[in-house]
Curated annotation (Swiss-Prot):
This is Carboxy-S-adenosyl-L-methionine synthase. Catalyzes the conversion of S-adenosyl-L-methionine (SAM) to carboxy-S-adenosyl-L-methionine (Cx-SAM). The keyword S-adenosyl-L-methionine applies. S-adenosyl-L-methionine binds at Y38, G63, C64, S65, D88, N89, D116, I117, N131, R198. The lineage of its organism: Bacteria, Pseudomonadati, Pseudomonadota, Gammaproteobacteria, Alteromonadales. Keywords: S-adenosyl-L-methionine, Transferase. The gene is cmoA. The keyword Nucleotide-binding does not apply. It comes from Pseudoalteromonas translucida (strain TAC 125).
């Protein structure tokens, strides 16, 4: 049974957002009501992983939370000898992810690991997924993380990246923010919840523009980049080595 997200329903001294036990308990409801098209994004990331998975390789889900993308990838893999490695830096998320994955049987092995992406060793990868993860990594560390991913991707391998983005100018950025807030209102969030969540997350999640993402990926060496989904200020893209 999905528990409704009411973390910010009452007035409070708002702390910086973190993926703690309180968030874990309501995360499925929170993400569905907060990210437009989340189910489509997760499903498509799985299909793309199945398309680009190479035999005898690893697939990574970096910032795996409760394992939605991991499960989607596992359902779509038809290639021999693939191993999925799911990583998150939240102990609460990792523990719940392991329990969640046990409820679904598959011949594709999955290892769920507690770890810092900045320190993670990536090896023999054909697919790396980051579903709304890079945005929580400090700006100064993003280039190094992406360079490490690129260096350890096999030729023809892909990075599947979903991010909250900001527009190129303030007028358009405010438009996208307003549309997103309307989406959250439609899904039952109050003005207080929207305001307090924004306060909680603004210091820990710092989005880039789409052009910043594409320029950085190209400069690192990816041969092709393409956005395949966008709704308001949420975008999913693929980068091919």
């Amino acid at each position: 049974m999905t528990i409704k997200d009411s973390i910010y329903a009452s007035e409070q001294q708002v702390k910086d957002f973190s993926f703690d036990q309180n968030v874990v308990e309501v995360f499925p409801d929170m993400i569905q009501r907060s990210v437009p098209g989340y189910a489509t994004i997760v499903s498509t990331m799985g299909k793309l992983a199945g398309e680009y998975a190479q035999s005898n390789s690893n697939l990574y889900d970096l910032g795996c939370s409760l394992g939605a993308v991991t499960l989607s990838m596992r359902r779509n893999i038809r290639t021999d000898n693939c191993h999925i490695i799911a990583v998150d830096n939240s102990q609460a998320m990792v523990e719940r992810c392991k329990v969640h994955l046990q409820g679904f049987k598959s011949e594709v092995p999955v290892t769920v690991t507690l770890g810092d992406i900045n320190e993670l060793e990536i090896q023999n990868a054909s697919v790396v997924a980051m579903n709304f993860t890079l945005q929580f990594i400090p700006h100064a560390q993003r280039q190094a993380v992406l360079e490490k991913i690129y260096a350890n991707l096999k030729p023809g391998g892909v990075l599947l990246l979903s991010e909250k983005i900001k527009a190129e100018n303030e007028l358009c950025d405010n438009l996208l923010i307003d549309l997103h807030h309307d989406f959250k209102r439609h899904n039952g969030y109050s003005e207080l919840e929207i305001s307090q969540k924004r306060t909680a997350i603004e210091n820990v999640m710092r989005p880039d523009t789409l052009s910043t993402h594409f320029t950085r990926l190209k400069d690192i060496g990816f041969s092709q980049t393409q956005a395949w989904y966008q709704c308001f200020n949420f975008c999913s893209m693929i980068a091919i080595k």
